[in-house]
């Protein structure tokens, strides 16, 4: 999956609603700040691994130097995680919860030069099992 596909699915209602199987960063990132250094180091390693994967995406890697690709990937990842956290903080049926996801997803995909496919809903294939 390329970066656009990852963010299309990550910043979605299905991911937001899948609290039990969703991203550890979004679910526990706030709690990690109060944990021992070993836990925070594990979170850091997970973030680094995800950044490595995103930076390898051709859309990001051809945008300049590896450092520039990393900066872009980090900015998008932080925006995506923040979108999930803030959307989850709202009631599930809140218009604001959905707006947060829509605005952030569009901004991230726009920065990648991508838009959702007309026939692909961001929640496709992400129904909790």
Which residues fall in each region the model found?
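Hydrophobic alpha-helical connector segments
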Residues: 1-22
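Well-ordered alpha-helical scaffold segments within catalytic/enzyme domains
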Residues: 31-32
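Hydrophobic/aromatic-rich alpha-helical bundle segments in the mid-to-C-terminal region
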Residues: 37-44, 58-123
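Active-site oxyanion/phosphate-handling segment shared across diverse enzymes
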Residues: 47-57
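Long, low-complexity, intrinsically disordered segments
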Residues: 123-129
């Amino acid at each position: 999956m390329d970066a656009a596909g990852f963010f299309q699915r990550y910043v979605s209602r299905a991911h937001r609603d899948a609290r039990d199987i969703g991203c550890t960063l979004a679910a526990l990132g706030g709690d990690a700040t109060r944990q021992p250094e070993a836990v925070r180091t594990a979170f850091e390693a997970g973030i680094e691994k995800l950044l490595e994967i995103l930076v390898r995406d051709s859309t990001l890697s051809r945008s300049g130097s590896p450092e520039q690709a990393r900066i872009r990937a980090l900015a998008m990842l932080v925006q995506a995680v923040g979108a999930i956290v803030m959307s989850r903080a709202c009631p599930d049926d809140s218009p604001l919860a959905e707006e947060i996801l829509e605005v952030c997803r569009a901004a991230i995909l726009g920065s990648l030069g991508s838009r959702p496919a007309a026939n692909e809903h961001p929640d496709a294939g992400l129904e909790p099992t």
